[in-house]
Design a protein with these regions (language model features):
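Active-site-adjacent pocket-lining segments in enzyme domains
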Residues: 1-109
Length: 109
């Protein structure tokens, strides 16, 4: 799986085609993509959010919606292979979902 950190790192990561290609590969192969806080902007730049439901820090809500995502103000949620968390204080809700998806993927391989 792939976990993308929050903070300012995603704004830097989204500038690299190799990062976006890897995110698209992980999504195409239905592998776990975990995002929290500002990390959703990487998925937005990778153009994989149309029709997906996720959460993030409210500061990028409109960016994600303009990329086609359904944004929900909740601590954490799963949409297929994408696990999203709102902010670092929501890690207690986010991490069990990440582990749930990893277990599901491990048992199906």
């Amino acid at each position: 799986g792939l976990l993308i950190p929050g903070g300012w790192a995603p704004d830097y990561l989204r500038r690299f085609d190799s990062v976006l290609t890897f995110v698209q590969y992980m999504n195409d192969h239905k592998k776990l993509i975990g995002i929290i806080c500002h990390a959703g902007c990487v998925l937005s730049s990778a153009n994989i959010l149309k029709g997906r439901t996720l959460t993030s820090t409210p500061g990028i809500k409109h960016d994600l919606m303009h990329a086609g995502a359904n944004w929900v103000n909740t601590a954490a949620l799963i949409d297929g292979n994408i696990v999203s968390g709102r902010r670092p204080p929501d890690l207690p809700a986010y991490m069990p979902l990440v582990l749930e998806v990893l277990k599901t993927q491990e048992s199906s391989e």
